[in-house]
Amino acid sequence: YGIDPDRIGVLGDSAGGYLSQMTGVTNGEKQFDKGDWLNVSSDVQAAVTIFGLSDLTTIGEGFGPEIDKVHESPASTEALLVNGPAFRTYPGASIMADRKAALAASPLGHVDGSEPPFLILHGALDPLVSPTQSAKLFRALKAKNVDAEYVLVDNAQHGDLPWFQKPVIERVVNWFVKVLKPVNAEEAEGAVL
């Protein structure tokens, strides 16, 4: 298909941001290589995450004790992801019931310094995923000397209009051009989708 395996970047927002993070932070972790083409690296060279989750153990952090309590429930999405649903004699479990499993399912649990460059964007007014999730990822990557940028977008919430404006789009496109250095980078400079 003419894809350069040395210039692969991933981007996602919200749940896709979580997937983008997991893809970037699991570079080189063979337990995630499944299926066909196992002779080809699944590593990526750049990752962009937009208002994604980085730590399943603290999803409610930054929103107050009432929201924290919601995320302690065995019925919370993150608890179901890690522990599965309640069934017959199994009552379910909170996300903190197995901290090791929760961290294994969290991007923060995989940061080891081998990550590609990251661009992390979050809305300053996000009511669904606290900006603390992105700030924690940024600090963890920087602590391991990973090339990472964190942009807190003023007046942006969770997938609302500010995300689809020229300044945000250009920031992401130009970052990919800088990091992945496409062959025709001169033509791509300042590109707008």
Each language-model region and where it sits:
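Short beta-strand/loop motif that positions the catalytic acidic residue
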Residues: 114, 119-122, 126
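Primarily recognizes the serine-hydrolase "nucleophile elbow" in alpha/beta-hydrolase
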Residues: 1-67
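Mobile cap/lid helix-loop segments that gate and shape the active-site cleft of serine hydrolases
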Residues: 24, 61-110, 116, 143
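Serine-hydrolase-like catalytic core of hydrolytic proteins
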Residues: 1-11, 20, 26-27, 108, ...
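Catalytic histidine-centered segment of alpha/beta-hydrolase-like enzymes
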Residues: 156-166
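Acidic catalytic loop of the alpha/beta-hydrolase fold
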Residues: 55-56, 125-129
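Residue-level signal for short, function-critical loop segments
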Residues: 53, 124, 154
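Catalytic active-site module of serine/aspartate enzymes centered on a nucleophile-bearing elbow/loop
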Residues: 165-193
